[in-house]
Curated annotation (Swiss-Prot):
Primary location group: host cell
Domain of life of the organism encoding this protein: Viruses
Protein name per its UniProtKB record: Non-structural protein 3
Membrane topology: Multi-pass membrane protein
């Protein structure tokens, strides 16, 4: 097995150097290799497990900045069209297959939604679902409970999505559009004004009936006779 590849560990080169330095006879070399075979096998399995884990993490990684997303996209292209051919050139076929197939599958997966919605952001953000507000997109936050509602921080006639301030004129035009593997629109249902002048905009599929403050849960309300 050749030495090299992404996280590829091998004892072959060490064994060959040891055999050459010790000048062992052919019979002893065979015995040594047979004794070390379980170790080399375990090393090979560990190497490819590490390759698979790292490449999967790399394929699913989602940078939080615009510069990071572009850099990650370019790095994936370089990996596919520069690094993988180098691995093939040096005979590391299994490494190259794992890396190429994992990255290509992820590109096809997110690229399908980019083609479907004619929006390259799915590829750059490396996700199959995005939320859009006034044409600006961001990751679908975990706080968007099962895509049923969303709470976005902002102020008077603006919201903050992904660190970017998005202004709007009319409340009628403000809504959250979820696109990708899940498609729905969350309408603005409630505007909560905070003491510091900030605003929390609540978007949902169903109308918001009311908001209960935590202090009200234990409030002693006197009865009226």
């Amino acid at each position: 097995m050749p030495f090299g590849g992404l996280f590829q560990l091998t004892l072959e080169s060490t064994i060959n150097k040891s055999v050459a330095n010790l000048k062992l006879p052919p019979h002893d070399v065979t015995v040594l290799r047979d004794n070390l075979k379980p170790v080399t096998t375990l090393s090979t399995i560990t190497a490819y497990l590490l390759v698979s884990l790292f490449v999967t993490y790399f394929a699913l990684f989602k940078p939080l900045t615009a510069r990071g997303r572009v850099a990650c996209f370019v790095l994936k292209l370089l990996t596919l069209f520069v690094y993988v051919p180098l691995l093939v050139l040096f005979g590391m076929y299994l490494d190259s297959f794992i890396i190429f197939s994992t990255l290509l599958f992820r590109f096809i997966h997110v690229g399908y939604y980019a083609y479907l919605y004619k929006n390259f952001s799915f590829v750059l953000f490396n996700v199959t679902k995005l939320c859009f507000v006034s044409g600006k997109c961001w990751y679908l936050e975990q706080s968007f409970y099962e895509n049923r509602f969303a709470a976005i921080y902002g102020g008077d006639h603006y919201v903050v999505l992904g660190g970017e301030t998005i202004t709007f004129v009319s409340f009628d035009d403000l809504y959250v559009a979820i696109r990708g593997s899940c498609e729905k629109n969350l309408q603005l249902m409630r505007k909560v004004d905070l003491y510091n002048g900030a605003v929390i905009y609540i978007f949902a599929e169903e109308p918001v009936v009311g908001i209960v403050y935590s202090s009200q849960l234990y409030e002693d309300v006197p009865s009226i006779n």
